C-alpha cells in the first residue's frame, strides 16, 4: 500500500479504512498471521486472519490515541522497582520510544513507522503471553 494513503488529515487523524489495509499488510509479515491466541474469540480474532488482527489493533488505537498520528502524552507509572517514572507515548499505537531502539522518536509520529513498530511490539507481547491484551486495559508497549 502506498504511504500517501496513510497521511493524517489536518488534525492528525488517519482514515480507518486505510489503517486496516496497512496493518493487515504488516501482520501478514509476522508470526501472528494465522496464530490464534487463547481467548481470542472475545476480541473477534477467530481464525488469526490479518484483517481480524487489524480490527483488534484499531480498537486498541481508538482507545489510546483516537487514531491520531500526532498523539503525544506523558504518563506516570511505577517501574518494577517501585519508582515513579514518566513515560512518553507517541503516535497511533501510543508507543514508548524507549522500546524502539534505533528509531528517532520524531519518526514515530509517521503512521507507517508507528504501525511497523506497534505491530512488532504487540507481536512480541502476544506470542510471549499467549493471549491478546484487553482493549480497555492500559498496555505499555
Task: Provide a role label for each language-model segment.
Residues 3-141:
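Catalytic glycan-binding domains that act on GlcNAc-containing polysaccharides
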